[in-house]
Amino acid sequence: MNLQVEVGGLKLKNPVMTASGTFGFGREYGEYIDLNQLGAIVVKGLTVNPKEGNPPPRVYETPCGMLNSVGLQNPGINAFIEKELPFLRDYDVAVIVNIAGETIEEFAYMAKKLDIDGVDGIEINVSCPNVKKGGMAFGINPEDIFNITKEVKKVTQKTVIVKLTPNVGDIGVCAKAAEDGGADAVSLINTIAGMAINIDTRTPVFKNVIAGLSGPAIKPIALRMVYEAARAVKIPVIGMGGISSFKDALEFMIAGAKAVAIGTCNFVNPNCTIEVIEGIKQYMVLNNIEDINEIIGSLKVD
């Protein structure tokens, strides 16, 4: 049985990845699961300088999901390279680093700095909807997506993935802009812009008012967008958004995703990624499927 997939030149032992921002730097989950079993670890978003993030509250539970407004809290790229990357190098798993810049120059600077041993890929975060400055403005403009991708590709030999925001009119146009800029793959979707209100105080739950919705509630939207993106580009698509079971993962792959990323479910069930991998294996056995690639893009549409 072959579970191996290739995403933009990156060979993964299986198609199951972690979604940035839900798995820390891998260390946090290392005591719960065997990290070597994962297809790839996508670490939480990094910025040039350390970032404290947004004031609390940062997380708010909703029916079938959650809103978050973390604000890209992270130690900065230098601290990651010095303190976190050595830990990840000890594992036999692809490491993809998510970067969030406030200017095109910052994206290029970080990508160049990460062109080092132990980093297998770079995910350009143009889509985080809970930060007042940075990503959001880039992610809604296809021209900006193209320009950032082009500049990042100039300075790195690593696999470059562009993470797209769902808060746009035509996801296919944005995916094509990333492809035209030289992206090796696109990943989608990031969180959907949402909000919550405290009816007693009549104030927003979050200081930033707008937050990012994730979890099972967004899965049908994510699935539709992955389907549209896969039809719009020739480069691989990584699907995510509300995946909490192997059945969810298979839906995304049948729709055209070459790999999938699991996010919010990690908070509820730290073993979710492993369960999805095992579930896919069982599905393949039951359906006499020898190669996972037979499933990808196999949707039958009349």
Swiss-Prot record:
Known cofactor(s): FMN
Q: Which Pfam families match?
A: DHO_dh
Taxonomically, the superkingdom here is: Bacteria
Q: Which InterPro entries match?
A: Aldolase_TIM, DHO_dehydrogenase, DHOD_1B, Dihydroorotate_DH_1, Dihydroorotate_DH_1_2, Dihydroorotate_DH_cat, Dihydroorotate_DH_CS, Dihydroorotate_DH_I
Query: Which Gene3D superfamilies would you find in this protein's record?
Result: Aldolase class I
What does the protein in this record do? Catalyzes the conversion of dihydroorotate to orotate with NAD(+) as electron acceptor.
Subunit note? Heterotetramer of 2 PyrK and 2 PyrD type B subunits.
Protein name, please?
Dihydroorotate dehydrogenase B (NAD(+)), catalytic subunit
Organism expressing this protein natively: Thermoanaerobacter pseudethanolicus (strain ATCC 33223 / 39E)
Q: Which gene encodes it?
A: pyrD
